[in-house]
Design a protein with these regions (language model features):
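Extended repeat-based scaffolds of very large eukaryotic assembly and lipid-transport proteins
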Residues: 1-110
Length: 110
């Protein structure tokens, strides 16, 4: 899918951005309520768990490291079309206090 600001993202890239609380649409990321972000984060975790057979919860850093180092999945995760923009945004989300707040909420009230 092509997403403004990212380019042509792979399903894994999209799942990771959504795990970080991004609401994606072909027009680009949109401002969203906490409820919308929490919902998309839950859906992304389910999709990642289903595709990988692993579950790192809502820990974006753990998922990121796993996907970077998995021989089978890293190629899709780092696929060149959108990787530069996706990686930049994942790095920002890893340090984003608002995303960490949402992650804490999900961990406290699954």
């Amino acid at each position: 899918m092509t997403i403004r600001g990212y380019g042509r993202v792979t399903p894994l890239q999209m799942d990771m951005l959504e795990l970080g609380g991004e609401i994606l649409s072909p027009g680009g990321s949109e401002p969203a309520s906490d409820e919308e972000r929490l919902s998309v984060m839950k859906e992304a975790r389910q999709a990642l768990t289903k595709q990988t057979g692993r579950d790192f919860g809502f820990d974006l850093a753990a998922w990121h490291q796993f996907l970077l180092n998995d021989a089978k999945l890293s190629e899709e995760y780092t696929f060149a079309y959108a990787w530069k923009a996706v990686k930049r945004r994942i790095d920002e989300l890893l340090d984003d206090p608002d995303r960490r707040r949402l992650e804490r909420l999900l961990n406290e009230h699954p």
